[in-house]
Amino acid sequence: MSPLIVGTLIIILLSGLATAFYVTWQGRLICAGVGLILEQAYEGGQMFNTLMAHCFETYNGVEKSGTQCVADWLKVGLLAVTFGAGGPRLVNTLGGSSPTTKRVIYIVMILLVLITLAVNLKH
């Protein structure tokens, strides 16, 4: 698979994990509208297509390269996609009935968010 597809799939996975932190603790009210849109896209099986379409949008009239697209998502897109509505279900599925496991998942998500912010601020 191409680096663009692999990068996009990784971002979908990471953003899905980070979603639960934002929606559960921080962004339920602020991001309800964005979350609803992303949830509908996800439920319709269109999340991947939505991300791919974003990658090939033009920026100042110049088509983005695959590398630039992945960089954009790592810097900014991950934070935006994390406002989706699917995260709590994912945490419940991964964590089962163990509160400890769920806490570990939340800690990982917080770290992902901090890394994303650091990458964004660095650029």
From Swiss-Prot:
Lipidated sites in chain (GPI-anchor amidated glycine): 96
Keyword hit for Membrane: yes
Removed propeptide positions: 97-123
Membrane topology per record: Lipid-anchor; GPI-anchor
Compartment annotation: Cell membrane
UniProt keywords, alphabetically: Cell membrane, Glycoprotein, GPI-anchor, Lipoprotein, Membrane, Signal
Intrachain disulfide bonds: none
Location (main, coarse): membrane
Record-given protein name: Uncharacterized GPI-anchored protein SPAC750.07c
Domain of life: Eukaryota
GO (cellular component) term, any one: plasma membrane
Signal peptide per UniProt: 1-20
